[in-house]
Amino acid sequence: MLTRLKVSNFKNLVDVDLYLGPFTCVVGPNGVGKSNLFDAIRFLSALANHTLMEAAAAVRDQDSRTAHVRDLFHRVGDHYAERITFEAEMIVPRRAIDDLGQEAEASITFLRYSLELAYRETADSLMQGNLAIVKEELVHITHGAAPRHLLFPHSAGDWRGSAMYGKRRAPYFISTTGEGENRVIRLHQDGGSRGQPLSRSAANLPRTVLSNANAAESPTVLVARREMESWQMLQLEPSALRKPDEFSASTRLEADGRHLAATLYRLGRHDGQQVRTVEGSESESQGQAITSQQLRDLASQLELTTQNAARVYSQIANRLAELIDDVHEIKIDRDEKRELLTLHVKNEEGTFHPARALSDGTLRFLALAVLESDPQMQGVICLEEPENGIHPARIPAILQLLRDIAVDTQEPVGEDNPLRQVIVNTHSPSVFQQVPDDSVVFVKTREAIDEEGRLCKKAHFLCLSDTWRAKVSEDAARGDLLPYLNPVLPKNYIEVSKQKRVVDREDMQQLLLSFSG
């Protein structure tokens, strides 16, 4: 869970210091930096598992073939900022698995990761430059300091007591010493002063030290790495949601919606385990006859799995029915011949329709409902403009679903309340008016003077007054919020057409008056 993010000189994010809660709605007009905030989160996530240049490529302008790594740096005219800095405070899970399948347990779960990057020219003028690490640090935040860092409402005993775990005396898990060519990044062992740190020259590091962590050398760093890897941008594609899955497919819902059927099938299996078939039991017995007890055990397992599947599918169908009228049942069809799993939804007429025949909106709702039910889905989930493709009357329902996906900070963290966070952005008045007021972060551009004395524009993040965010953030002006409360301007405000607008109709005006009255 990302609780605070500081960014400077990344695109138009300059001196940004943003506190985050379990659910955050970033509101603002186009072009002010809402997407850049998501890009910063995606960039940090990519850096946890890829090289510096691969991570940069993941967030550069996808529409431009000539996009340059330097475009990530804040620019004023022809001048680029020299360095990009990030600082992320996060609560991480207790345990994680490394690339070799080894389990690691964090010695403490409230951490701060800092990273400073510079642009480095190459000797070959035909090649673009590279990114270089100036500083990389990972430190812990103590239990005593937690109330000063976790500003959103939460239960100190139930939620914070379960989310924050462990202790540590030594300050650093990763530290940086020296300057220039002598700069060294040290990976400290979880034993603190008792273990010797592993030192690496920062001069030519192709990736962050955190991205190379494993369970044996640095379990806490590995857990932080896995947490950052889980930060994702959810971009559900109807074509991906409609595809059936092979039996061998991943059972984790991807950011584009792939493996929806396989994920739902996993949730329906008892204890997450695949049902053993009679044929499988025979092969394990190396041709020996199956005993009556084995058959009874297998029948019992099959019955439990069937009951669990019915319960899970019913829960998700009921959730979906709150959002869409024509959904009464869901199931996964298992095609043994083609070895495919296909999602089906039954309508009020009793007809089952495969995923390929479902509407985009239904599939999107279904994916979010599955995500809500999946305890394995943790970390940060970013979603742009959740209102897109949704009927206006359904917007409150999808907003409630997104809020329910996020962790409940009044209850202990556990399988039924995973450490999960949702951040959405929007410029829709319908969304702005219906989210909790303390979840709103308003973005606008503001003129400022950079370090060299040049006039520039940067993203400025504001909040609504009398919310927990007001402790650390400036209040948004009422004039900036007015368009989101009255999305249609008065008739005489600007002459756009001589035709009568819908809002100008007398019956519409009466309807508006009845709501406002």
Q: What is the predicted role of each segment?
A:
Residues 353, 396-517:
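C-terminal lobe/lid and adjacent interdomain/linker elements of RecA-like ASCE P-loop ATPase modules
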Residues 22-63, 363-371, 401, 425-429:
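Phosphate-binding glycine-rich loops of NTP-binding sites
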Residues 1-14:
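N-terminal pre-Walker A segment at the start of P-loop NTPase domains
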Residues 97-300, 304-305:
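Electropositive, glycine-dotted interaction segments
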Residues 39-110, 116-122:
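Conserved P-loop NTP-binding catalytic core
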Residues 15-21, 373-376, 415:
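Phosphate-binding P-loop
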Residues 29, 290-293, 311-373, 383-395:
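Conserved ABC ATPase signature
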Residues 5, 379-383:
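Hydrophobic positions in the central parallel beta-sheet of the AAA+
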